[in-house]
């Protein structure tokens, strides 16, 4: 996952930045792949903008493109 420099999260490393495409990295295990697909789907719900990851404390992460 990449970080978002303009994310409102306290821990910017928990912010996921997705563009217009579903760039999914297949990691070592099937579980990791499923997690990435879920993250991509959640990001798509927010118009492809950054969204806090599951471990981020904030609930309304507002990132620009």
UniProtKB/Swiss-Prot annotation:
Metal-binding as UniProt keyword: yes
InterPro entries cross-referenced by the UniProt entry: MT3
Signal peptide location: none
Taxonomy, superkingdom: Eukaryota
Keyword field: Metal-binding, Metal-thiolate cluster
PANTHER family reported for this sequence: METALLOTHIONEIN-LIKE PROTEIN 3
Protein family according to the UniProt entry: Belongs to the metallothionein superfamily. Type 15 family.
This protein's name: Metallothionein-like protein type 3
Organism whose genome encodes this protein: Musa acuminata
């Amino acid at each position: 996952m990449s970080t978002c420099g303009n994310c409102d999260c306290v821990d910017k490393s928990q912010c996921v930045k997705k563009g217009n495409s579903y760039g999914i990295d297949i990691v070592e295990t099937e579980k990791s792949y499923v997690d990435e697909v879920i993250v991509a789907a959640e990001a798509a719900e927010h118009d492809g903008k950054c969204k806090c990851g599951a471990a981020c404390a904030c609930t309304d992460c507002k990132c620009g493109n």
